[in-house]
């Protein structure tokens, strides 16, 4: 009887953990498609003004001229 009780409790914990992780995965997928994501962000083309490398489409900003190269 003790063995059956332990197996039952283990199965309940595994089911709960699986359901919980599924909910978290959906939330994580939603966050990765956020507008701030690198894949959906807008960028400045070559020759446009920039302050840092991550603003340029090719990810290179000239510090001397403050333009994307």
From Swiss-Prot:
Signal sequence interval, chain numbering: 1-17
S-S bridge residues: 43-57, 50-61, 56-68
Protein name from the UniProt record: Conotoxin Eb6.14
Protein family membership: Belongs to the conotoxin O1 superfamily.
Organism: Conus ebraeus
This protein's domain notes: The presence of a 'disulfide through disulfide knot' structurally defines this protein as a knottin. The cysteine framework is VI/VII (C-C-CC-C-C).
Subcellular location as annotated: Secreted
GO MF, one example: toxin activity
Extra remark: This precursor corresponds to allele E1bii. Has not been merged with other alleles since they may differ due to geographic variation (see strain in PubMed:19606224).
Tissue expression: Expressed by the venom duct.
Gene Ontology CC: extracellular region
Residues excised as propeptide: 18-41
Keywords, sorted A to Z: Disulfide bond, Knottin, Secreted, Signal, Toxin
């Amino acid at each position: 009887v003790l063995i059956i009780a332990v197996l039952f409790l283990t199965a309940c914990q595994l089911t709960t953990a699986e359901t919980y992780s599924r909910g978290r995965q959906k939330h994580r997928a939603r966050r990765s498609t956020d507008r701030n994501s690198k894949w959906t962000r807008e960028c400045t083309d070559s020759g446009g003004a920039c302050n840092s490398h991550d603003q340029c489409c090719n990810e290179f900003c000239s510090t001397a001229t403050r333009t994307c190269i």
